């Protein structure tokens, strides 16, 4: 084992099973109007979350015990309950699906809906805006209206719809005129298509001074590079970064890119001895990547694409296919059990799976390359975040797991990440060998982690994406959790986490879910709302202030998207702001 020491950890949670609780609306709810934008309700929770400069909880034990009666409870899957947030914060609506795009193109006319009903059966396609990137520029970026001042503060996001009609938008935060509030960056071509699908992740690369977006589209996915000027230049990087179901993407202070893949694996029976048992356990199939560019200021100049490899008991943990020799793949292996055992750490390192100096710049399948090289697969890791102030030596990532109670209710599978998990990776300095450790093993109560963002240097926010199947099985909607990152020791689960947001369900999402549950012919949209696009940033476009460098996030702005249904983007603000 390496002698490297993990400098801080998250608290593993007890593997308890949640009994669905009655829908309880948090006390202290209020609603109002802020700058012409609707603010949702907010509630209390048992433990206040501070985003002040030092991040310390200044309350005494009696105050904390008193708050135990004010916990924020999850919403049941019934009706359209409000979305609630812990005390001290409120939600301000920034944009919603029905908002107009100032430069419509083909079927792309609204922020969150395509203009395809009719003839599209049932209803218009929802475009599912996803990961947000907040940026502040010193100059007006310009737009389709000449000489118009679009401001200096912007929020960018990709949209996850398919059919070659996914697109990228820019919300002009300083603009109040609805006619110029939202700008389309990727208009359709002569055939009425953008030829993009499932645009999910987004980030700003301060070295290239460009935006990067990912397409979570399996072997047809990849990375899109977009300039911030007007009109923007758009190109793909398939010959350099490969094609895969990429989702999270994050630069470090050297210009390297951390890329997270979400590609669901083959499902197998939850009971290997019973062929009639549900096929709900997914074989680990997705990888954690790092791209080391030859020139940080020009990604097209090539470089090395690497993938994470962990050693369990001194042996590399590699992909095992589901086939005649391995009918359950690696789903039930001892190695997967060890990997997901809280309190353990495992040596890990980066292995090169593609080098443009050797392999050229032809398009390639990154997932296949990672498997061939012996990288370690995970159960759909969707996003990652660097620990603020860690010098980019530490990052967290979150496999979503199986999103199915048929799998999670099997103890052998729950112990192997069926409910989802959060891992931590440490590479101190320029060390070639790091440590991988599981810091949250999901449960029925805290499950299916999809999105991560640091609220401050010690509080990690994790959004759930359970999906309609798991929502129905447990009669619970999603939440956003806050986990305490603490240096040097474990804490009890009581003090390590709390529910930060209890997601509700808007009326459009309720209708979608009813149609989907009924199997309405031609229905093509998602059902229940999902929290996504968690993003906390001061908006700096500078290399010297790259997101993750500073430990102090006191001046950062906070955003998230209530995806599906009305497709609402919210800003999270302090209640007194």
Regions found by a protein language model. Give the residues of each.
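Positively charged n-region of N-terminal signal peptides that target proteins for export
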Residues: 1-4
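Bacterial N-terminal signal peptides
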Residues: 6-16
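Sequence/structural signature of beta-propeller domains
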Residues: 21-577
């Amino acid at each position: 084992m390496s002698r490297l020491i993990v400098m801080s950890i998250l608290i593993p949670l007890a593997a308890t099973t949640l009994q669905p609780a009655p829908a309880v609306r948090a006390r202290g709810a209020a609603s109002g109007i802020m700058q012409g934008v609707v603010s949702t309700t907010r509630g209390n929770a048992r433990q206040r979350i501070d985003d002040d400069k030092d991040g310390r909880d200044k309350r005494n034990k009696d105050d904390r015990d008193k708050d135990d009666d004010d916990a924020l409870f999850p919403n049941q899957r019934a009706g359209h309950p409000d979305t609630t947030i812990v005390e001290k914060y409120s939600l301000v609506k920034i944009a919603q699906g029905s908002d107009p795009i100032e430069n419509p193109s083909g079927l792309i006319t609204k922020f969150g809906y395509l203009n395809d009903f009719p003839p599209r059966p049932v209803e218009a396609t929802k475009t599912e805006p996803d990961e947000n990137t907040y940026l502040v520029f010193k100059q007006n970026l310009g737009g389709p209206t000449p000489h118009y001042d679009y401001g200096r503060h912007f929020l960018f996001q990709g949209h996850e719809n398919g059919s070659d009609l996914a697109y990228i938008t820019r919300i002009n935060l300083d603009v109040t005129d609805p006619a110029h509030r939202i700008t389309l960056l990727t208009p359709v071509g002569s055939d009425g298509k953008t030829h993009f699908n499932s645009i999910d992740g987004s980030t700003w690369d301060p070295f290239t001074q460009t935006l990067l977006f990912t397409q979570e589209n399996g072997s047809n996915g990849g990375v899109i590079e977009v300039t911030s000027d007007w009109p923007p230049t758009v190109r793909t990087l398939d010959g350099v970064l490969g094609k895969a179901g990429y989702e999270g993407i994050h630069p470090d202070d050297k210009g390297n890119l951390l890329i997270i893949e979400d590609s669901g694996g083959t499902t197998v029976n939850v009971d290997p001895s019973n062929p009639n048992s549900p096929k709900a356990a997914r074989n680990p199939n997705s990888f954690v990547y790092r791209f080391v560019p030859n020139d940080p200021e020009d990604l097209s100049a090539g470089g090395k694409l690497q993938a994470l490899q962990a050693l369990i008991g001194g042996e590399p943990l590699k992909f095992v296919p589901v086939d005649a020799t391995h009918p359950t793949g690696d789903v039930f292996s001892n190695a997967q059990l060890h990997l997901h055992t809280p309190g353990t750490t495992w040596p890990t390192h980066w292995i090169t799976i593609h080098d443009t100096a050797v392999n050229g710049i032809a398009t390639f399948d990154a997932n296949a390359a990672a498997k061939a090289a012996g990288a370690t697969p995970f159960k759909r890791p969707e996003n990652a975040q660097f620990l603020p102030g860690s010098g980019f030596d530490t990052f967290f990532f979150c496999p979503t797991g199986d999103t199915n109670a048929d799998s999670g209710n099997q103890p052998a599978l729950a112990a192997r990440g069926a409910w989802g998990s959060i891992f931590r990776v440490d590479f101190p300095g320029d060390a070639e060998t790091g440590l991988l450790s599981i810091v949250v093993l999901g449960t029925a109560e805290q499950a299916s982690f999809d999105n991560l963002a640091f609220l401050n240097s010690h509080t990690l926010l994790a959004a759930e994406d359970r999906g309609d199947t798991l929502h129905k099985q447990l009669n619970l909607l999603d939440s956003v959790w806050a986990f305490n990152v603490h240096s040097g020791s474990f804490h009890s689960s009581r003090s390590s986490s709390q529910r930060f947001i209890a997601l509700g369900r808007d009326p459009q999402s309720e209708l979608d879910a009813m149609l989907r549950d009924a199997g309405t012919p031609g229905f093509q949209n998602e059902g229940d709302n999902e929290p996504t696009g968690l993003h906390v940033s001061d908006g700096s476009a500078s290399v010297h202030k790259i997101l993750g460098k500073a430990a102090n996030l006191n001046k950062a702005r906070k955003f998230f998207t209530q995806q599906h249904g009305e497709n609402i983007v919210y800003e999270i603000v302090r209640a007194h702001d």
